[in-house]
Amino acid sequence: MKKGIFKAIILLLTVIFTFSAFSACKNDNTSDDGDDVKTVTDVKTHKVEGTLHDVNVNYNEPVGTLSANGRTEYTVVSSSGYSVASKFVSKHLSAATGVNFPLEFAEECNLSAGKYIVFGLNELIKSTVTVPEAKILGDQGYYIKTVGDDVLVYFTSANGAQLAALALLRALVGYDMMSVDCVIYEKAGDVLPAIEIAERPDYEFRINSNEMKGDAKYGMGFTQKSGMLQTGTGNVHNLYDFFTQEDVENHSKWFSEGAIVQRDAVGGGKERVRIGQPCFTAHGDKEEYEALLNHMSEQIIEILKNKPDVLNMRISQNDVLGENMTWKCTCAACNASYEYYGTLGGAMLSFANDLAKKVNAYIDANEPGRIFNLVVLAYQEALQAPVQRKNGEYALDENGKGIPETRYDFDEQGNKTVVSDENGQPEKLVCGRGVAYEFAASKANWIHSFYEAENREFASAIEAWAGLGSSNLYIWSYEISYYQYLYPYNNYQILLDNFKYFKEFGGNFIYPEGTWENMNNPGFAKLRDYINSKGMFDVNSDYNELVDKFFKYYFREAAPVMRKYFNEVQVNLTINENITGGRVHSYGLSDNRVWPEALVTGWLNSFEVAQNEILKYKETDAELYEALSKHILIESLFPRYVLCTKYDKSFSTSQIKEMRKSFLKDFEDLGNTTHQEHFVISDVTSGWNLD
């Protein structure tokens, strides 16, 4: 690229950032002439009502001294059942203040005998203060209150203990975690402020997006266990794990034509494969359908007996990739069901309801009160809702939700029979007891929120599914280009809005799929982790505040340089959206027109500046220096990868060889393995001749 063109791009970016800064510095939301100045991160604000985040922490009127002169009078007293959370509290109080906070495990505590942080001794706490009702706090809510110079921390579950621990630390020492190697304390921890906090997470199941160590998952507030049934294949697209190839031979109607679940493996033995699809109607054969329900329910019941932590199981079709090119079963019954409901979701929901009845019978007789959901994966051929339509569009009720269809079953010839309820009336197809659905719109435009026109088609499907009676919406969202892991995907500013949108329709379980194969992916994946951790807990979190805080602490003195790079990447992607599009399964993001060589080279030079900005820590705080240097190194992988793969002809043979060696070493040393979902980096580097 000519230098003049490069300068023009930089000038354009500079003008945009000048106006962005002008807008950000104003005290209100309007400019002097009444025209708002739009920035990349200036999106319409949505707010979800009815959440519980009642936080009152008063440092101006402290009720005690938490630590002074290298000591504390406080002891953390915890129920032994919550040792993980209470140890976490003691550890970080000690780290923040430099004072050892002793931890004792007991089921009782005499508050008059000393100064205490009482953690999870609920009978004592309830006898001392009035705690919110269980229906308000739910399973993971908590209540924290100072009484005199004691701190009482109430919760009712291990997940609640985790969140209560984080809230307590935020109040006492200003705790936060941006990544496993970036923990901050914004308060000195010397005074004990007056505290009264009642909170409940907006999503109970907050699943981390990218590959993450357990310490980070805990410290950032992600749910430790999803409760989703895990088989040998995983926790999705795994129904074939309930069958053998003998089942395919003996019960061919349980599968689409040509299905293979097991075959001879190279070197002997059997290997599991997923070719074809489950048939959720058993080809319309009533006896085979009943046998299928019995087969599945017996195996699920055995799992429930042995795995008390299992809360959910996905009812999902196989993914269409590799050898499997079958989207759905095309037997007469399945085709008739698809034509009637307009989606595979009708057959899947009917199957899930029938299966749940058998599983619920076991639960009622043997484990009354146990929560277990069969979750229909609304994905691909099942994405659309099995509800009433009018002129090809979803018919909605007065609340803007789908109107259920009458349920029909279909026989081997595709003829339909109405299903009657216990009163002999036509049954409506809704989510029965212990049945939910998970929305997984892999073809949506995930650089735009579901409030925006770009996703109206997919938002309408969520609104339609919402009429089918499930109290909890499960969401499988997407937040990176799966064909180009190393490229930045410009969705940062819409993450919170999507959390809000899904919450408005009952969102309670969310998994935003990211680079699940890489530990330290570039493209500001760590920023997404941080935004996700906050937004899943409180959907009304402020995006700009989160981004500002992240850069301030994650990069320290290098923050201005790295923020400028981040802003330029966002603007560059915004002005090139007509090229990249927003699909997560597309190669548009790596189009050469989006990443001119001079622009990428300029960004690469900025990382040298960033590294120089943190050099002072090399001698004074080696641990901090290593963390900051690593953070910068992670982000450098993207422009280096572009130069190594797209502009190798611009360098001599020896130069490009060293660049590629250096890139590959850093990429792998950072714990990364793949450049594209399911495809390892050696698929690219094997042709680099690095020997």
Residue ranges, per PLM feature:
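C-terminal motif of bacterial Sec signal peptides marking the signal peptidase cleavage site
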Residues: 20-24
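Bacterial signal peptide processing site
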Residues: 26-28
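Acidic, contiguous N-terminal accessory segments
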Residues: 32-143, 183, 188-198
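Glycoside hydrolase catalytic-domain groove-lining segments
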Residues: 397-400, 430-432, 439, 444-479
